[in-house]
């Protein structure tokens, strides 16, 4: 959530899902630790902002993205999340169907991809420190 700029978009999505229960929207500003803690308790995250999607992936929370930028598409594909559609043309029925499908499916691919990304990040870190020590 880019607070307060995204509140209007959240209200629009909420109007699509008004008959659904157990769906909550964050409508306040949070620091990084609070945000990670909140997301870690989610059963599912529907988001547009890259940082929210990254936090969901890190916390092993199934993520669905509404894309507004190629960087979101790239991250979702890399992380094994689900792209629900584009902000320019997503429809209510499409969003609800994707949400319902994701709700019933564990994020196996997402978790596998995140483990691969963690391993690659660790390898890059080790190589960086080796270079700094003059070992490579």
Predicted regions and their residues:
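Active-site anion-handling motifs in enzyme catalytic cores
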Residues: 1-136
